[in-house]
């Protein structure tokens, strides 16, 4: 299902009602004292995280939300009724920014999390509050305060545990198809993936994790080349990055070690924090190498890559197209995720201004 992951909206909480300036006028009490009640508070606006919502598309069509004004106070000490609050339901993973300052107002990271994003104005005071020993018939009252008014930018960042990195045509979409229920487009040409994809990987009946596939990076991506760099924001909440490398490229001029090193370089240039996440090397397309040559090809690559990058993390040779080697990878990911704490959400890159579409497929 396609969904919008960014929207801009205007919100205005309700103004407070005005206080009343009235006096008791009862039989036999023609000069009664003040009895003007206070105005009601304006309705506030809240954002609530809802795991049953997967998109911000509703906020593309309805962009203005204005809270109800509090009612004015009345005579006989009648206080005005408060304005009704507005509840805006958003997907879990939505980050709410002040559009003008880019300050993060709220980060909806858990289901049913509720955050006030615009406070309703206080009701004005009735003249009953201004009575004193020297002023027994006050005509003073105050008007209600204005409700808060904001322009907001909503950004949905997918909540995936594992993210896939690599050049176009490295086999990322093939891998996510092989081990999850996601069904991204797969073809034998680069740039097949044009939008991020999510897939739920079932380890067993009780364990699963979410994997995100984004369009491939190319050299020069940090300077704007290709599609992948604009989608990297969707990997910021992942806990493990899988760097897929085509170990058997068809192009004789291709150098897998050089290409893999280039991807890491682009990642560091664009987002050093993302580059510092645990990153595992996955050597794909083992099926294209004769069986008797596979072990040597893997050893030679690892030796050259470690020399070029000082990499000392785990390495998983696989053939995504037929599933070879994917089970050890899945179990290793599951075990590592169990030992890791959930990432702190809030320290996010605020420079992404593009609006994207994501394809989410789960079981």
UniProtKB/Swiss-Prot annotation:
Cofactors named for this entry: Mg(2+)
Record key words, sorted: Cytoplasm, GTP-binding, Hydrolase, Magnesium, Metal-binding, Nucleotide-binding
InterPro entries on file: G_OBG (IPR031167), GTP-bd (IPR006073), GTP-bd_Obg/CgtA (IPR014100), GTP1-OBG_CS (IPR006074), GTP1_OBG_dom (IPR006169), GTP1_OBG_dom_sf (IPR036726), OBG_GTPase (IPR045086), P-loop_NTPase (IPR027417)
Compositional bias segments (type: Acidic residues): 346-356
Positions of the UniProt region annotated as Disordered: 342-363
GO MF annotation list: GTP binding; GTPase activity; magnesium ion binding
Domain (OBG-type G): residue spans on this chain: 160-338
Annotated GO CC locations: cytoplasm
Catalytic activity, EC: 3.6.5.-
Family as reported in the entry's similarity comment: Belongs to the TRAFAC class OBG-HflX-like GTPase superfamily. OBG GTPase family.
Function (record text): An essential GTPase which binds GTP, GDP and possibly (p)ppGpp with moderate affinity, with high nucleotide exchange rates and a fairly low GTP hydrolysis rate. Plays a role in control of the cell cycle, stress response, ribosome biogenesis and in those bacteria that undergo differentiation, in morphogenesis control.
Protein name stated in the entry: GTPase Obg
Organism the protein comes from: Dechloromonas aromatica (strain RCB)
């Amino acid at each position: 299902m396609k969904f919008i992951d960014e929207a801009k909206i205007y919100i205005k909480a309700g103004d407070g009602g005005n206080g009343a300036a009235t006096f008791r006028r009862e039989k036999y009490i023609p000069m009664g004292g003040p009895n003007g009640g206070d105005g009601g508070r304006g309705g506030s606006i809240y954002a609530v995280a809802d795991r049953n919502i997967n998109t911000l598309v509703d906020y593309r069509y309805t962009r203005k939300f204005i809270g109800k004004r509090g009612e004015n106070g009345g005579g006989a000490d009648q206080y005005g009724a408060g304005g009704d609050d507005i509840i805006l339901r958003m997907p879990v993973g939505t980050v709410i920014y002040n559009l003008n300052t880019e300050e993060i107002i709220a980060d909806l990271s858990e289901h049913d999390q509720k955050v006030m994003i615009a406070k309703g104005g206080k009701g004005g005071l009735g003249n009953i509050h201004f009575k004193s020993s020297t002023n027994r018939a006050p005509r003073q009252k105050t008007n209600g305060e204005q409700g808060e008014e904001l322009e907001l930018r909503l950004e949905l960042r997918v909540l995936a545990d594992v993210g896939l990195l690599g050049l176009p045509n490295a086999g990322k979409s093939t891998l996510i198809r092989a081990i999850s229920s996601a069904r991204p487009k797969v073809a034998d040409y680069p740039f097949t993936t044009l939008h991020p994809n999510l897939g739920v990987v079932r380890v067993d009946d009780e364990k699963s994790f979410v994997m995100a596939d984004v369009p491939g990076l190319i050299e020069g991506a940090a300077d704007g080349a290709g599609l992948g760099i604009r989608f990297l924001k969707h990997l910021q909440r992942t806990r493990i990055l899988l760097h897929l490398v085509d170990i058997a490229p068809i192009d004789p001029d291709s150098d897998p070690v050089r290409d893999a090193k280039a991807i890491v370089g682009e990642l560091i240039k664009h987002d050093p924090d993302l580059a510092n996440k645990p990153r595992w090397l996955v050597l794909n397309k083992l099926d294209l190498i004769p069986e008797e040559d596979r072990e040597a090809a893997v050893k030679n690559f690892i030796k050259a890559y470690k020399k070029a990058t000082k990499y000392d993390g785990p390495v998983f040779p696989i053939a995504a197209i037929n599933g070879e080697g994917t089970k050890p990878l899945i179990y290793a990911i599951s075990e590592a995720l169990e030992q890791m704490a959930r990432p702190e959400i809030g320290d996010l890159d605020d420079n992404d201004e593009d609006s994207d579409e994501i394809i989410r497929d789960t079981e």
